[in-house]
Amino acid sequence: MHKDFSDAQAFSKSFDDPARDAWQRPAEVIEQMKIAPGSVVADLGTGTGYFVGWLSRAVGPSGKVLALDVEAEMIRFVAQRAEQQQLSNVEPRQVAADDPGLAAGSVARVLIVDTWHHIDERAQYARKLAAALAPGGEVWIVDFSADSDIGPPARYRVSPEQAVSELEAGGLKAEIVQGETLPKQYIVRGARPPGQDR
């Protein structure tokens, strides 16, 4: 699914709408991820940077948040946001649509919110994410449920079972996260199998 996200200011009205907090539940998502202070995390498909403040606080001053997006305008917007909010540990980066541009073994967590369904060749992409994970690293996908009243058209949605399958095809051990309370989304976690730890 390809959509024009080049107008960051316009998308900020919906992406950063305070009403989003009620269904996105960012505090719950971050808590589930168990991010260690001082770690490096990636916010893949960062958009206008809705999650960067939460991630910045989770990793702390000695950690780093890589805010990744394919749209140059989104990256400019996030850079301004990080400067205004004094998030010195946020590093916005423009990446290619088919490559997260992450060095091998470089990140502890990758958060992918409302973005997985936009990626083509997801199993191949998952393989690149798996290679980027440090020992104990995890990929977290948060995307729209089939019955959600918001999100992409039904034909573009990716089921949690499909997301699990795609992460596993990329070499990760994946599962649907149980016990979360997001009303419009699911969470899937993919971890590096222990034997792959370097």
Please name every model-derived segment.
Residues 1-42, 50:
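Class I SAM-dependent transferase core
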Residues 37-38, 61-62, 133-139:
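Short glycine-dipeptide loop
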Residues 42, 46-100:
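Class I SAM-dependent methyltransferase SAM/SAH-binding core
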Residues 56, 123-138:
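A short glycine-rich, Lys/Arg-flanked "PGG" loop and its adjoining helix->strand segment in the class I
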Residues 98-110:
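A short acidic, Gly/Pro-enriched loop at the edge of an enzyme's catalytic core
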Residues 108-122:
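A short SAM/SAH-binding and catalytic strip from SAM-dependent methyltransferases
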Residues 138-164:
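Conserved class I S-adenosyl-L-methionine
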Residues 176-198:
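Core SAM-dependent methyltransferase catalytic element
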